[in-house]
A protein has these predicted regions:
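Short amphipathic alpha-helix that is part of the acyltransferase structural core
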Residues: 1-60, 67-74, 139-178, 212-215
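Conserved acetyl-CoA binding element of GNAT-fold acetyltransferases
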Residues: 70-82, 213-224
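Conserved acetyl-CoA pyrophosphate-binding loop and the N-cap/start of the following alpha-helix
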Residues: 84-96, 225-233
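Conserved GNAT acetyl-CoA-binding A-motif
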Residues: 94, 100-113, 238-249
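Glycine-rich, histidine-containing beta strand-loop boundary motifs that form or position
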Residues: 112-115, 122-123
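Active-site/acyl-donor-binding loops of N-acyltransferases
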Residues: 123-142, 220-228, 232-336
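Amide-forming acyltransferase catalytic core, primarily the GNAT-like/NAT-type
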Residues: 129-233, 248-250, 279-282
């Protein structure tokens, strides 16, 4: 048994395992994924009996954490061939990947779990619940200006997203031109696209959509006052109700139903890096110390002292006096 990181030219070797384990994914999507995403990601594998039997992929995303940009990794395609399961392969891959990311001082990693219980023992915790809404087809719609974006419109999409997302959350994915160039191709691989909505020539909304067995809309960004334009647009996608993922609260009045579903789990990696970018609200102060227990990334297992500065930033140091003890998982729930 050999655990190693593949060279980029070897990434295609994992496609066979992906097709076996994730058989619902279409050929069109995998063609896109293995042509685009595997050019920039990392793939860790375990080889045995001359073949790749287990894998874990790390896709890079530029995230904005408070005022600081970070390159963080999204864990995806954690898979083991059926006859090689229950041998601890996933655990070995996960621990190795986490240690490597810790060595790069990456603040945290994240994933969408197949089951919460798989990742809780590794101190992953849910930190984000996605608002999911169902929209009925609108009985009467108005004529609207709309088109599907091309890769050449990625700059326009990015500028619109930056304006809409700035200040809305302390942690979010940076949707720059590169993000949208890639996203256009991803949505096209799922028989969809990125729809641009306009009013009198002005861009008032964008959303991603996929039309496979069902129709789904993702990441809608709509200017205030143009909610019905969005409803008009998605009513033209399908005769059946449309599910909208990551639905903004402002669109809820138009929806038939809305629910929140736990979606993203986070695992803190390099704790000092993460703590150093935290801030306190204006007019507030912070002074505390606590011990952290991290059985996997033991470099985090120290006694940390946090003191806020006049500009709101937090000074992070080590101390010998602890006011309490936290597991790294419990700290994740507090920080996020």
């Amino acid at each position: 048994m050999e655990l190693r990181r593949l060279e980029e030219q070897e990434h295609q070797k994992t496609r066979k395992l992906w097709e076996e384990v994730f058989s619902d994914d279409t050929r069109a999507f995998l063609d896109y994924y293995y042509f685009i995403k595997t050019k920039e990601n990392e793939i860790w594998v375990i080889e045995e009996d001359g073949e790749i039997q287990s894998m874990l992929q790390l896709n890079p995303y530029q995230l904005q954490v408070a005022e600081h940009p970070f390159l963080c990794r999204y864990i995806i395609a954690v898979a083991t061939r059926a006859q090689y399961r229950s041998r601890g392969y996933m655990s070995s891959l996960l621990r190795k990947a986490m240690q490597e990311m810790y060595g790069k001082k990456e603040p945290f990693t994240f994933l969408m779990p197949a089951a919460e219980a798989i990742y809780t023992p590794y101190d992953f915790r849910f930190v984000y619940s996605q608002r999911q809404a169902v929209f009925e087809k609108k009985a009467e719609t108005e004529l609207i200006e709309e088109e599907d974006a091309t890769m050449f419109q990625a700059e326009e999409l990015a500028a619109f997203a930056k304006e809409r997302l700035f200040g809305t959350a302390r942690v979010y994915a940076v949707r720059d031109a590169h993000y949208y160039q890639t996203r256009v191709l991803e949505q096209q691989s799922e028989n969809g696209g990125i729809r641009m909505l306009k009013k009198d020539g002005k861009l008032v909304g964008i959303y991603c959509y996929a039309k496979e067995e069902t129709c789904e809309v993702l990441e809608p960004l709509i200017l205030p006052g143009y909610e019905t334009v969005f409803w008009d647009s998605i009513s033209g996608l399908s005769e059946k109700p449309v599910k909208v993922l990551a639905c903004p609260e402002v669109l809820e009045p138009c929806a038939r139903s809305v629910e929140r579903k736990p979606m993203i789990m986070v695992r803190i990696l390099h704790l000092e890096t993460l703590l150093s970018v935290l801030t306190v609200k204006e007019g507030e102060s912070l002074s505390c110390s606590f011990a952290v227990i991290d059985p996997i990334l033991t470099g985090n297992s120290r006694i940390w002292k946090l003191c806020s500065q006049e500009d709101g930033r937090i000074q992070v140091t080590e101390t010998e006096d602890s006011q309490g003890v936290l597991t790294i998982g419990a700290l994740t729930e507090l920080v996020f």
